[in-house]
A protein has these predicted regions:
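Short, internal strand/loop/helix patches
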Residues: 781-816
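Secondary-structure boundary elements
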Residues: 23-145, 181, 271, 364-368, ...
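Hydrophobic/aromatic-rich core segments of domains that either
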Residues: 21-22, 105-110, 115-121, 130-140, ...
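Short, acidic Ser/Thr/Gly-rich low-complexity loop/linker segments typical of extracellular
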Residues: 280-301, 626-650
């Protein structure tokens, strides 16, 4: 009896001890807040308040308590994929507090699987795809705009899923291997495993999107997990803020390759960064960096395609192009050095497509299409209301510049209107319009009234600025709050009042003193912003430390606040202020001085397919900084949208700082292979270096790749008349496109074709665009794709054209868009299915080849 009583008492004691232990170690709201502050980057800790993070944590735990799946989410997934507020490099906002109840009402009675699908439908109801610059808007700003690029769409969806307690993460390929672009989508944790979906692109099931096949061709697929994550995925790297993992083996075939870095004597180089590069946008772009161990080795798991591995030390560098799966071990020899003029040519072959699509019944597809149509109608009604409000504002102003500004505001029109009214009340309308004209289009869509007022009221007037400065410099380099890709904040009053009046005058008259102040007072550490999230100027001033990029933004912001014209040079990234001329700022040198300048004269002998090469599309230039080659940015439009200058618009010769460079050019083939040509060259002070831009061409001539029955009929969507390609075209070649209502791949295709409108109108290639239904055609027309060539024939396919193409050309199902070039003899000489960048140029290249064969 005593033994039994002893055992009972002991058991009870152990039970209560375990309960207390569990309570002590439970992941509480307090622990979650500490977790956020332990791993968040410096900018997030100084630019946002503790109250803000408390609110976000509160809603995460509220969702865990109220959502039916809350108790089933493991602590690891909840901690790393629900609690974190940040998804990418977006501005943070109060999305959770604002939309929790609305989203809860949509999903509280659903299974976890169906809830993920429903949240994506909710996102699509508010947002559709459209390209923009590289700065990522906050989720609520994206909703206000009603559209965003893939990075903004996926940031919105991840935020929305986390808001209702569903673990979610953004997955991205830094660069595609088979075409010039990148992409981001979302993975959600459902019942023990991760599933993917296209953000704001609802499908009837998970693991389905237009990018199934492109994803299978990726070399790298990464996600950055907040904190020190110990999940089952392969870890690429760990930092003070995040764990970078790869998920590429979930989408296609992969292999692990080991790399050894040695010097010219064969000695292994320990603790050395190795950059892994993908050819994309006419450059070898670094997509991941790893560090060698004590044996000079590191490794990478990647898709079965070609990449470049690069390393440098003490001014010497080495590189090796490799194809994953061909060799288990690759050696990089540091046997190149600055000043050596060499030429290299590589064929960069992407992985082959290998995708498996989940089953979707006709009923599921029909219901999903019905939902999409309804969501489109809601979003289009919102857009129409915005347009009406914009037109009303335009009608009430006679200022043509202001009219153009209002047209760009989308859902932010009221903020801009309120600002203009505020400025008019202070007799400052001209200055206000100048300010609005010198921020980006995206700024017009998401800037706050507080920011605009601060910069209007606290920016020195032109008369208070440097007199020798050209008048146009005032608006762009003093008045404008936009410096780089930072979050705009109301910093002017704080920065302009920071120094006493006498000190402000000293800095204004002698900007080198301001350079010295920043050197001496702002501690620089690039580990403070490993995710490349700029710290705001106010945050830098508060913390007195920053990464180099945030320091540069801070200097320019402070200089402008003191009436000094300043910028980060958009081409080479140099920080500069304007005295009698633009002067480079060097925070690492005793004195700032401009680099000696030489010139580059690029010669090009036109070929039929490319008469005027385009930067980022056909060629790029990089400068050696002693360790890496840094891309020069020759943008035709706003920076960050990857739209480069035509070679014909470059200065001839083009001024460049003295130094060592590489000119890379490439030709993208139909199968995604890139034929590259790279030249190392030097620029010497006062001298002109002449180079010839080489675009390699394939040796093969025009080839028949399949057949298509040109007698297949389609129906005119407007008249109901039935016709076929043979009747319309007779004995010529033609372009046939099978399109959908306007998905992201179709949108890209239309934009690529519109970019070459005049070329297509002058060509001998008629275009026929067909759709699977009149409803799809009507939705496509609602998209208002501007700039398409005249004379396009539209049709409705009853399935015969689709079935013929899929079967005869061995395509992967009805994955649109599908483009072919064929003739009325049923010969197909070009085929492209799904997501493609540069389609317009590829079609015209085939048109040139057709013309040459007929001569």
């Amino acid at each position: 009896m005593k033994n039994t009583l002893f055992i009972l008492i002991t058991s009870i004691a152990l039970f209560f001890s375990a309960c207390l232990s569990e309570k002590e170690t439970a992941f509480t709201e307090k622990a979650a807040l500490e977790f956020l502050y332990q791993y968040m980057p410096l900018g997030d800790s100084v630019d946002y308040t503790e109250e803000y993070y408390r609110e976000c944590v509160h809603y995460a735990f509220l969702a865990k308590q109220e959502m039916p799946w809350g108790a089933s989410i493991p602590e690891r997934e909840f901690k790393h994929f629900v609690i974190p507020v940040r998804v990418n490099n977006e501005n943070l906002d109060r999305f959770r507090a604002t939309y929790y109840e609305e989203l809860k009402g949509r999903v509280k009675d659903l299974t976890l699987y169906d809830a993920v699908l429903e949240v994506n439908h909710w996102c699509h109801e508010h947002v559709n795809y459209k390209g923009s610059d590289s700065r990522t808007s906050a989720p609520m700003a994206t909703i206000k705009t009603s559209w965003g690029r893939c990075g903004e769409e996926s940031t919105l969806l991840v935020t929305a899923l986390r808001t209702v307690g569903i673990p979610a993460r953004q997955v991205y390929t830094p660069r595609w291997a088979h075409c010039d672009d990148n992409h981001a989508w979302v993975e959600a944790w459902v019942d023990g495993q991760w599933h993917f979906l296209g953000a704001c692109e609802p499908e009837p099931v998970l693991d389905l999107g237009w990018f199934n096949e492109p994803a299978s061709r990726t070399l790298l697929l990464h996600t950055r997990v907040f904190g020190n994550y110990d999940g089952p995925e392969v870890v690429i790297s760990r930092s003070a803020n995040y764990t970078e993992i790869t998920v590429v083996d979930n989408y296609g075939k992969t292999v692990k390759t080991t790399f050894t870095v040695v010097n010219s004597d064969g000695k292994p180089q320990a603790n050395l960064p190795v950059e892994f590069k993908i050819y994309n946008y006419a450059e070898f772009c670094t997509v991941v960096t790893k560090t060698t161990d004590e044996n000079g080795q590191t490794w990478l798991t990647a898709g079965l395609g070609c990449m470049m591995a690069y390393a440098a030390k003490d001014g010497k560098f080495g590189f090796q192009v490799f194809r994953s799966g061909e060799k288990e071990n690759v050696t990089i020899i540091l046997n190149h050095e600055k000043g050596t003029e060499e030429v290299f040519e590589f064929d960069m072959v992407p992985p082959a497509p290998t995708s498996v699509l989940p089953e979707v019944t006709a009923e599921m597809r029909a219901e999903n299409d019905r939902c999409i149509a309804y969501e489109d109608s809601l979003r289009n009604a919102y857009i129409a209301d915005c347009k009406k409000a914009q037109q009303k504002l335009i009608m009430n102003t006679g200022n043509k510049t202001l009219c153009r500004i209002y047209e760009k505001t989308w859902g932010n029109y009221q903020t801009i209107a309120d600002f203009v009214k505020y400025a008019q009340g202070k007799n400052q309308e001209i200055k206000a319009v100048e300010l609005l004209s010198n921020i980006s289009d995206k700024d017009l869509r998401d800037v706050s009234l507080e920011v605009l007022k601060d910069h209007l009221d606290n920016t020195p007037g032109l008369e208070q600025s440097i007199i020798s400065m050209p008048p146009e410099h005032y608006s762009q380099y003093i008045l404008s709050p936009r410096v780089s890709n930072e979050m705009l904040v109301p910093y002017r009053k704080t920065l302009s009042d920071f120094f006493p009046e006498a000190e402000r005058r000293q800095y204004h008259d002698n900007p080198t003193l301001l350079v010295d102040w920043v050197k001496n007072n702002i501690k620089t550490d690039d580990n403070l912003a490993l995710q490349r999230i700029p710290i705001s100027p106010l945050g830098v001033l508060k913390a007195r430390k920053a990464d180099r990029h945030s320091r540069d933004i801070f200097f320019v912001s402070m200089a402008r606040s003191l009436g000094i014209a300043a910028q980060i040079n958009p081409v080479n990234g140099n920080v500069q202020y304007f005295g009698k001329e633009w002067t480079n700022v060097n925070f690492d040198a005793a004195e700032s001085a401009n680099a000696a300048v030489g010139y580059l004269d690029i010669q090009y002998y036109p070929i039929a397919s490319v008469t005027d090469p385009k930067y980022y599309t056909h060629f790029s230039i990089k400068k050696f900084d002693g360790n890496s080659f840094r891309l020069l940015a020759y943008d035709a439009k706003d920076p960050g949208i990857d739209d480069g200058m035509m070679l014909s618009t470059f200065d001839h010769p083009t001024p460049l700082d003295e130094g060592y460079y590489i000119l890379t050019a490439g030709t993208r083939l139909d199968d995604g292979t890139a034929l590259t040509h790279s030249q190392f060259f030097s620029i010497k002070a006062g001298e002109t270096t002449q180079l010839t831009l080489v675009l390699r061409q394939p040796n093969d001539e025009l080839q028949v790749v399949g057949s298509f029955y040109a007698d297949n009929k389609f129906t005119d969507p407007e008249t109901g008349e039935v016709g076929n390609a043979k009747q319309l075209i007779q004995d010529e070649y033609f372009i046939l496109g099978l399109l959908d209502q306007g998905s992201e791949p179709t949108t890209h295709a239309m934009q690529d074709i519109a970019a070459f409108r005049k070329d297509f109108e002058a060509s001998n290639l008629p275009m026929i665009f067909v759709f699977s239904s009149k409803e799809e055609y009507d939705k496509f027309k609602l998209k208002n794709f501007s700039g398409l060539p005249e004379g396009i024939v539209y049709g409705i396919d009853d399935g015969a054209i689709r079935d013929d193409l899929v079967e005869s050309l061995h395509l992967s199902g009805d994955n649109r868009p599908i483009f072919i070039i064929a003739n009325t003899n049923s010969e197909v000489v070009f085929v492209k299915q799904g997501y493609t960048i540069g389609l317009g140029e590829q079609l015209l290249k085939i048109e040139k080849a057709i013309g040459s064969t007929h001569q």
